[in-house]
């Protein structure tokens, strides 16, 4: 009740001053049209179109970021489909040659899962178990079709899931 009384006391003088000022002002032709439009509630078509365009663009930006559907735009895909697409991208990057390892150390191991991201997942898990950071010889590079990869692919096994970096010995 007290905030309502304070609000009424603040608004009262403001309303009385604006009604007095309105009588004293002389309006031009443009000002009168704006006042009558605002008082009657009849919108001007060109202004309404511009406001709608502004509102649409901001709405589209917001809902696009939030993943909601706006006028035929599909929401963000589920995690399952995104995972499948990520695996597909990894397969496309690897191509038919698989992985190449920098340096001369190679180790063939049998892995249970030979899916598209199995090597990367297993190498991350093996690095988490170590207390020391990996050195430059343990760096795994993707083959992107260079001449060096053509020579090393003849010696390396065809299955990319069997290639793991060997820890260096001091």
UniProtKB/Swiss-Prot annotation:
One of its GO terms (molecular function) is receptor ligand activity. Residues 1-16 form the signal peptide. It is found in: Secreted. It comes from the Eukaryota. Residues 107-170 are annotated as: Disordered. Residues 123-140 have a biased composition (Polar residues). Its main location: secreted. Keywords: Amidation, Cleavage on pair of basic residues, Hypotensive agent, Mast cell degranulation, Secreted, Signal. GO terms for biological process: detection of temperature stimulus involved in sensory perception of pain; inflammatory response; mast cell degranulation; negative regulation of sensory perception of pain; negative regulation of systemic arterial blood pressure; positive regulation of cytosolic calcium ion concentration; positive regulation of flagellated sperm motility; positive regulation of saliva secretion. The keyword Transmembrane does not apply. GO terms for cellular component: extracellular space. The modification Methionine amide is found at residue 66. Residues 17-54, 67-170 form a propeptide. PROSITE patterns: TACHYKININ. Belongs to the tachykinin family. Tachykinins are active peptides which excite neurons, evoke behavioral responses, are potent vasodilators and secretagogues, and contract (directly or indirectly) many smooth muscles. Hemokinin induces plasma extravasation, mast cell degranulation, muscle contraction, salivary secretion and scratching behavior. Increases sperm motility. Induces potent analgesic effects and may play a role in pain modulation. Promotes survival of bone marrow B lineage cells and of cultured LPS-stimulated pre-B cells and may act as an autocrine factor required for B-cell survival and proliferation. This is Tachykinin-4. It comes from Rattus norvegicus (Rat).
